[in-house]
Amino acid sequence: MRPSAFLLRARPRNWGWLWLLGCWLALWAELELLTDSRNYYGPLWSPVLLYAAAVVMCGCAVAYWLDRPATSAGPAATLKRVPVAGLLLLLGGGWVLSVQAPAIATRPISLNYSDVIVILQTYVARFRSGEVVYRYLTNLAYPLFPNHLPLQWLPYVPADALGIDYRWWAMGLLLLLGFGAYQWQLARQPISWLEFGLKALLPTYLVVRLIQSNPDIYALTCEPTIICYYCLLAASVLGRSALLQATALVLCLMSRYSVVFWVPFFLWVLWREVGPKHALVVASLTGLGVLGVYVVPFLSHDWTIFTHALAEYRIATLGEWGGHAGENGLPVHLFGGTGVASWFYTYGPADINDRITVLQRTHLLASAGVVVLVAWLYYRLRAQLDYRLAALIGLKLYLATFYTFLQIPYLYLTSLTLFISVFVVMMVGFRRAPAVEPVVTAL
């Protein structure tokens, strides 16, 4: 039986509560498998279960939304909730900062802990002094050619000028911009005040749980900035502005390449559903953003930057696979329970180089393949499923796949997918179908 036919037949009309429950249970499973139960089922099966939870969430969300109309929200109700959303955002932010503060205080920025922030500081220092940013770093214990895209380090130029710790700046961006975008979309949903309050505090609760479980996660990295970008992307998918959609795409593409396979699917959906004009505006603005942020100021001065960065990724992967062994003699980050690299390390070819190559090819095939699957399902179900929700659910499934097959599945990287789940859960309501804003071409 075809997957689309199965979804239609396996979805009793009065079973919306079942799909709602499935989404919440899947979110709980993802959170547990990244916090208290991380690696509980072993380094081989824990990442499989984590990915399965993401698949279940996407399946339940699709089943919930089939044949449900995406109604518009009332502006009066939205305006009433915006101040409350802002208050809850501040309260949640204070909760996160109170938990994050001890972690940052006990982990100074030093190569003794991590090289991530030191590298970002070097980029920023070079940029502010007018030096060439993309040349070999000489302040580390090993030679490294810069392999970070501009929007991984450019946001910290103001922080550096103001003398603010990059980690606080990153968390502030997530709380104010990323979660602010989430709160704005949530305020527009026709749901009860109780459900609104519960969902309003959900993102900050996830951050708190992640930090409490592993204080290093956002104290040794600036990952909250990247999570912020993807929250903006998820919110823009549900919004109406071509400018915001393009801005979010530029932020994501120019910080990491993670979303690159999903972008053509999203533009195709916009072309079909909204119209060629809107899709072309989004594509053009995104292209201009990439040119303005990366190609013209940096890449055009040295076209080998891109290939150098790819080579550094390979070198870093070899270093992780061949070293950083834990008590069991196995690479710590590969066997941390967040990615299937452990399977390829255990059962792959004898040579480590060959194992990595097999995983990289599988990663590309899986990432591209899941986009093809999502596109096919969207096309088959386009009459029963709102395209904006199809794009959001597709983004969740794609990112879950992409990060599951990473060559170095760091916990802080994988945590990003959890916050896309929050947007999916936000869109399934306890009472009636939540609202999705009508999309028009607007700047």
Positions of PLM-derived features:
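Aromatic- and kink-enriched transmembrane "portal" helix at the membrane-lumen/periplasm boundary
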Residues: 153-154, 197-224, 399-407
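Start-transfer (signal-anchor) and selected internal transmembrane alpha helices
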Residues: 1-99, 381-397, 425-443
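Specific aromatic-rich, kink-prone transmembrane helix
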Residues: 223-241
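Membrane-lumen/periplasm interface segments of specific transmembrane helices
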Residues: 27-33, 278-395
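Perimembrane helix-loop-helix junctions
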Residues: 262-288
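Transmembrane-helix motifs of polytopic, lipid-linked glycan transferases
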Residues: 166-193, 374-376
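Extracytosolic helix-loop segments that constitute the early lumenal/periplasmic catalytic or substrate-binding loops
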Residues: 116-141, 304-307, 316-319
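Membrane-interface alpha helices of multi-pass inner-membrane proteins
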Residues: 234, 243-267
